[in-house]
């Protein structure tokens, strides 16, 4: 039952092989046993989970269950949850209990999913290793001396270790896809605006997007279907017809399920910088795609090399504005001793924020300051437009773009802690997708040295989530990398 897919759990619940309460208890007990070694969870809501499970059992008995009714999951700790701590991995919000649910949380509650708790994350989603959390580093289930990736490292590690079958995440520059790659799970970031950001604590508002983690593309499709949907409370949320992503996974007729699919391989993604073990796994995955009927074509993303510098101007600029609301006045950490109001602001923020958050606030404030706005922020926005245009030129030649999710496998905890630039470069293949607002997915495609997972990234055109999920699903029907477990 622990390793069952969401569809298998659905059948077990519907046929009364197991109850929602029994299933929730099974995973809660597993969290209690395994989480101390992984630190994947910040908050475990046993009482709330069992209450939700009892309600799910009532829905099943009444014949009104949906695909996720009674299925356990966890939320990244930046989604507001009514009555439950929402810390964003920060001392600043260590005692913050949200008075309302995020849109994603309320949709999943309505679907009958059972939330077991809140997962650990890089502080305010700023990081690529899950080492900046106020609650300590998350450890990779495949090797607990290594990072799981970030910033959604807790969600990725929880799914990889089967502490939960599903988890939510957020992706600003790769924060779903990169940890999915490092922990051997599947993760998808949809098109910007497909998932509401209401109640999702902001890092960089023009880049942030909620995403989904599961063992497989099928599991992610079921979760994303429930998460996505128009929300008038988020001005960037797109009012468009709802999609059933799971329904799009049906195979095409014939022995070559991906016949006719054109996969673009950006030459910039396969240049220097990719580790040999990652390259070998990615090449083998592409061979498997060709065997399934896809054809590969070389494309170019000439401005891809500028994505990281552009991102580290735009994202900190937006963060410096978004995080100005955390001042110790109405909620959040307040310094115990201060002289006047200005001193209270300074001390509360100095004590409440960690080093990486302070670094990005300083950078963001600098690039928005008088005399530097045109030189940095405006130029970065121009680069962003060029990157988006590069993708559109590439999609004129292909249906899906593929490449490595990360240039290396997971590194040792502490290895890059004192070198922010090296940490930032771990997202070199993922950041451009956020700058362009495109959907991206990472799925397991093999192992590198030390049996550390490697992920393949698939990038789609706008609203191409169904195609990405269906493409990954066909690969997973012909391979078993997504079935491998750390144990």
Curated annotation (Swiss-Prot):
PROSITE patterns: AMIDASES
Enzyme Commission number(s) from the entry: 6.3.5.7
Pfam families: Amidase
GO aspect biological process, one term: translation
Magnesium in keyword set: no
Catalysed conversion reaction: L-glutamyl-tRNA(Gln) + L-glutamine + ATP + H2O = L-glutaminyl-tRNA(Gln) + L-glutamate + ADP + phosphate + H(+)
Enzyme class, broadest EC rank: ligase
Keyword ATP-binding: yes
Active site per the UniProt annotation: 76, 151, 175
GO MF term (any one): ATP binding
Transmembrane segments: none
GO cellular component: glutamyl-tRNA(Gln) amidotransferase complex
Keyword terms of this UniProt record: ATP-binding, Ligase, Nucleotide-binding, Protein biosynthesis
Disulfide bonds: none
Record PANTHER family: GLUTAMYL-TRNA(GLN) AMIDOTRANSFERASE SUBUNIT A, TRANSAMIDASE
Subunit relationships: Heterotrimer of A, B and C subunits.
Record function comment: Allows the formation of correctly charged Gln-tRNA(Gln) through the transamidation of misacylated Glu-tRNA(Gln) in organisms which lack glutaminyl-tRNA synthetase. The reaction takes place in the presence of glutamine and ATP through an activated gamma-phospho-Glu-tRNA(Gln).
Family: Belongs to the amidase family. GatA subfamily.
The protein, known as: Glutamyl-tRNA(Gln) amidotransferase subunit A
Organism, scientific name: Azoarcus sp. (strain BH72)
